[in-house]
Amino acid sequence: SANYVKTRGVDIPNSLAPALLFHPLPKGFKLPSGPSRFRPSASTPVVRPADLEDLAFAPVTELAALVRARRVTSVELTRMYLERLRRYGPMLQCIITLTDSLALAQAARADAELAHGIYRGPLHGIPYGAKDLLAQKDHRTTWGAMPFKDQWIREDATVIRKLEAAGAVLVAKLTLGALAWGDVWYGGTTKNPWDTTKGSSGSSAGPASATAAGLVGFAIGSETWGSIVSPSDRCGTTGLRPTFGRVSRAGAMALSWSMDKLGPICRTVEDCAVVFQAIHGYDPSDPTTVRDVPFVYDANLPLRSVRVGYYRSAFDSVKQNKHLSDSVLTVLHSLGADLVPVEFPADLPVDHLTHILSAEAAAAFDDLTRSNRDDLMVRQIKNAWPNVFRASRFIPAVEYLQANRVRTLLIEETAELFRTVDVIVAPSFGGNQLLLTNLTGHPCVVLPMGFTDRGTPTSVSFIGGLYDEGRLLAVAKRYQDASGHHRRHPALR
């Protein structure tokens, strides 16, 4: 058709969304209002260790206490993490670019500000890594893919800019599975630090691997369908996938304009809360972001005040490590939770809505496909982006729109479920909740629930109501503090 030929001639940047903007709001839903409140756990005195590398696995909250008290400088922390990145990064294949000059300059500025009484908050002087789909104007942004390995985007992503304003120090741009699928990128396969014969999963492969290995204080990942949950499960990290529209994606690679979300990958739930506090909020550069929605977090929220549901059929059908998933419910009971059995909507064909993602991804990278530069992609198997992009050009527009209409029904039914409970605990890969909640835009916290017989971590997920990250994080924190699985770390050689 002449129409197609003419539109193909228009130069459309990857980030430009269609005129049809997605918002996950069910009918009659009122956005939360009021002031934000952030009440973290009471701080405990932290002593500088004799060997600074003993802080490699410390949570952000402990690092922040040391930096604020000026017992440790940001430059010292930054040099320590840069050294670990150089030492272990090649083995784990988790680094695309070390941003050492930028990092040392940011760290020196953080220390100078502290010396003059300027403290930007709990991320002041804390080193972190960013998934390399986030633009940073002084370095390449490769999207993990060979066709883009020399790409330079001369702007900072909003999240990068917000973290700089919070005083954080960018030490590395970390790997992602090429164009945000899996753990294979143009330079290799990112490894799981608990078992380096295995991949880290993805697509936030580097953020999870590097955080688990103590190479950064925290990291920023992204999720479209499992890309924070899956590598966090594999690597034993704690991740927050925020509500769709809570965190700006401006300056981030677009894969699915209606499903992409950015969030932190950390060592603790409270670290996720600290990072989320810094990066969330409205951004005119991303029209899907919401205005004036508060973030209310209270680390000491009584569990009895929260209606906690558990995804009964998914827990009942667990085959592997069932003793670990059952222990999650036991711990929650012991903390005073009155667990209510619930089920996610089962009458709609959730598993058959994946072509929403495939169609949007194919459109986002249509120029790559039509230019034949997709031949440069490392993975050319059936279930990898080059071939999925090619096949998805044959998805009829009518079917894409009809799938999104079914998605609207799914949003309404899930809203009904969250009228009965505030938080739902579920096996991370149980039933269809992972795809379902990515389609509906609900927030999720994934965290370790124990270790398999092979000594590798596995996880559980807590899902919250729309824009209710504060309560979700508080509940997940109560479980994490009681279970303590996050305190174990891999032994690197």
List each model region and its residues.
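Serine-dependent amide/ester hydrolase catalytic core
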Residues: 1, 60-66, 105, 112, ...
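Short glycine/serine-rich loop segments
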Residues: 155-279, 427, 438, 442-461
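A short helix-breaking turn/cap at a secondary-structure junction
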Residues: 44-46, 238-326, 371, 375, ...
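Gly/Ser-rich, acidic/histidine-flanked active-site/gating loops
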Residues: 43, 48, 53-61, 89, ...
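Short, well-ordered beta-strand elements
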Residues: 264, 456-468, 472-476, 480, ...
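Short helix-loop capping/hinge segments that flank enzyme active sites or metal/cofactor-binding pockets
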Residues: 32-52, 57, 123-146, 302-311, ...
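Gly/Ser-rich catalytic/binding loops embedded in alpha/beta enzyme cores
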Residues: 1-225, 243, 330
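Short, well-ordered beta-strand elements within core beta-sheets of diverse protein domains
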Residues: 62-69, 148-151, 260-267, 390-395, ...
